[in-house]
Every structure is written in structure tokens, then in C-alpha cells.
Amino acid sequence: SDFHSTDVRELLYDCLRGTEHLAQQRNLRITPIFDDDPVTVSCDEIHLRRAFTNIITNALRYAKEEIIIECRQEKGKAVIRIRDDGEGIAPELLPHIFDRFFSTRKGGAGVGLALTKEIVSLHRGTVHASNDGGAVFEIILPIG
């Protein structure tokens, strides 16, 4: 796989263009809050874009009005936060959402978040889900 130095903000804008139709369909706002300066990571763009898209698509599925996407550099790391204003993740499900084949959607294969975690791990990063109003997904990647 090809790792290149990439501005995460650009990748996220790509993902937003790719999920725009879903946002419009559901009449949702997407609010990006990005650093003014590049947030650079060494990554396989195709894979990392897929990881982000999986989370953004989920957020758009559960949001009521808005999803907020933050991207910034913090203490030598790239921090990406994707939050929705939906019901949040049921506490009993939180420990399992990254498990392979686990899905809350009937008929959903549930490989989305497991694959996301795998991709983030390949980039020496972490992904963590929590609730703060709606669901919050935080991806932390090494800068480089």
C-alpha cells in the first residue's frame, strides 16, 4: 500500500463531497471546523478516506440536524472528531461497535466500523467512540 504525506483536511473535504448527496437527502448541515494550517499525516489516502467516509456516513444516518467535523493538530497528533446530534450510541452497544459483523442496523453487515478501526490501526492511530449529546468519533493519528 502507498503511504504519502497528505493534508487530512483535503481528505476530509473529499469525503464531504462524496457524502453531500446523503446530507441533502436528509436535509442535514455539515459543519467543518478545521485548522487554518495543514494537518499532515503519512497515509494511504484511499484507505483513510474510506475510514472517514464510514464514520461520516454513520453520523449522517443518525443525525437530526447537523454533524460537526473537527480537524486539528494537537500535541504532535492529528485529531479528527466527527460528532452528530442524534440519540447517541446505546451504552450497552458502545463496547462492541468496532467488532467485526456487529451491526445495530437490521440487515447491516456491520463491517464498516471494524474496517475503520483496522485502517486507523494500520496508520498507527486510534479510534474511539463516546457520547456527548450525540455520538462522537475521535480518530488520532501521528503527524508526519
Label every model-predicted segment.
Residues S1-D2, T40-C43:
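Conserved micro-motifs of the catalytic ATP-binding
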Residues D2-R17:
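A conserved beta-strand-to-alpha-helix junction within the catalytic ATP-binding
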Residues E66-G76:
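Short beta-strand/loop element within the Bergerat-fold HATPase_c
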Residues D84:
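Acidic ATP/Mg2+-coordinating residue in the GHKL
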Residues I89-F101:
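Short conserved segment of the HATPase_c
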Residues G112, T116:
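Short alpha-helical Gxxx[C/S/T] motif in the catalytic ATP-binding
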